[in-house]
């Protein structure tokens, strides 16, 4: 077995919730550390995230100390992480060998710049760059279709962050990890060399299967469940509007929302404004395990109303429980959701609500699509398969 030394830079990780990139580096590190040496570079909040996800026992950590700077607010803390990570890359010594793998877990500067610097200092090492979503056009905002609010300012900052990093990755990275076929077009030269790998994401199939064996036929308490970050791209505000349409047809319909994020206060206000307090339950962020699995098991459908997205692991975790998914017809979903989902024209909130109501009223159709969803996940969405993809390409 070829042995590698992995250096994973994940200084952008923060908060209780997990982004897709966070989930990928954590699950990779867990499995890689069984046979490989793994060092994860994070700051204190990222370390706490890893610890909550059960990663702390199996890898080595290098923790950036930015506690002093974080007293001055998010922006100063953010900048401090960038400069501290750069300085760390300047002074750190690693083995200058092709068996040394530097993995930048995101395109954010505190992950990509130290990886770039180490690649310059130690040219024999191999840089694997994570690029799991290309920022939207700042003039279009977070949408691929009709949307009342596009969150253009947030989109601009996201675009600006990626602007200097993409050329560095194109020129210096040895491999790029993306999570759908469309993203490969961002790195055509590397793709022609076979160095762009599509990592579709995965779910913890083994844990879910074990839970389902022990907890069969739980009562359906919730009609629909949503899981995801309360972020502009995820459509959480519009989901409340959708649910208002649903309850006009099914007055007692219940929606469970798992997640947290910058739009939480707006979500709560929208629920109050539309008087949906009895129809929507907010759980906040729920960690992996029996509580979250119970919510999925007690639900009939999962919705993923993102207006701009490159994947959808959060919804696919629920699909592993046999829940059919409903989402907007985004371009990335052609490869990410080949089955088990009903797609709606982007921005058609009434149409989205109609599909929810139709599936809730048609158990046979709901169960059929749910079986397709579960089959797709069980056959193709194992983390062990994703790690095998990575190690196979590294051996080339």
What are these language model-derived features?
Residues 341-350, 358-363:
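Conserved acidic donor-binding segment of nucleotide-sugar-dependent glycosyltransferases
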Residues 268-286:
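Nucleotide-activated donor-binding/catalytic signature segment of Leloir-type glycosyltransferases, i.e.
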Residues 20-23, 27, 226-245, 262-268:
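A conserved mid-protein helix/loop that constitutes part of the nucleotide-sugar donor-binding site
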Residues 182, 202:
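Carbohydrate-associated surface elements
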Residues 117-121, 134-137, 149-176:
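Membrane-proximal helix-turn-helix segments that form the acceptor-binding/catalytic region
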Residues 307:
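Aromatic "clamp/platform" in nucleotide-sugar-dependent glycosyltransferases that forms part
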Residues 1-53, 57:
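N-terminal subdomain of nucleotide-sugar transferases
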Residues 324-327:
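Short hydrophobic beta-strand element within catalytic cores of glycosyltransferases
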């Amino acid at each position: 077995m070829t042995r590698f030394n992995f250096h994973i830079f994940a200084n952008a990780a923060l908060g209780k919730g997990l982004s897709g990139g966070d989930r990928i580096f954590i699950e990779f590190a867990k499995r890689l550390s069984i046979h490989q040496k793994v060092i994860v570079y994070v700051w204190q909040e990222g370390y706490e995230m890893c610890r909550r996800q059960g990663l702390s026992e199996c890898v080595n950590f290098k923790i950036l100390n930015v506690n002093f700077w974080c007293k001055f607010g998010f922006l100063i803390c953010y900048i401090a992480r960038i400069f501290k990570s750069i300085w760390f890359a300047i002074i750190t010594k690693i083995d200058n060998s092709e068996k040394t793998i530097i993995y930048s877990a995101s395109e954010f500067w505190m992950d990509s710049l130290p990886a770039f610097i180490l690649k310059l200092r130690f040219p024999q090492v191999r840089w694997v760059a994570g690029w799991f979503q290309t920022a939207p056009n700042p003039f279009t905002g977070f949408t691929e279709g009709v949307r009342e609010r596009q969150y253009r300012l947030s989109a601009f900052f996201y675009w600006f962050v990626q602007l200097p990093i993409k050329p560095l990755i194109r020129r210096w990275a040895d491999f790029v990890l993306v999570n759908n076929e469309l993203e490969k077009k961002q790195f055509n030269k590397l793709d022609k060399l076979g160095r762009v790998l599509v990592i579709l994401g995965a779910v913890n199939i083994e844990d879910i299967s074990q839970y389902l064996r022990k907890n069969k036929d739980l009562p359906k308490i919730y009609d629909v469940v949503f899981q995801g970050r309360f972020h502009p791209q995820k459509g959480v505000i519009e989901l409340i509007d959708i649910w208002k349409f649903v309850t006009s047809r099914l007055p007692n319909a219940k929606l469970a929302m798992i997640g947290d994020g910058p739009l939480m206060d707006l979500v709560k206000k929208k629920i109050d404004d539309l008087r949906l307090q009895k129809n929507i339950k907010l759980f906040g962020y729920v960690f992996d395990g029996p509580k979250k699995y119970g919510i999925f098991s007690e639900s009939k459908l999962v919705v993923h109303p993102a207006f701009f997205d490159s994947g959808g692991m959060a919804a696919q975790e629920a699909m592993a429980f046999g829940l059919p998914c409903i989402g907007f017809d985004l371009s990335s979903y052609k490869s990410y959701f080949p089955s088990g989902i009903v797609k709606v024209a982007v921005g058609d909130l009434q149409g989205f609500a109609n599909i929810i109501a139709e599936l809730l009223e048609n158990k046979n159709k709901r169960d059929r699509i749910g079986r397709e969803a579960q089959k797709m996940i069980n056959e193709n969405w194992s983390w062990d398969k994703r790690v095998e993809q990575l190690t196979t390409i590294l051996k080339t």
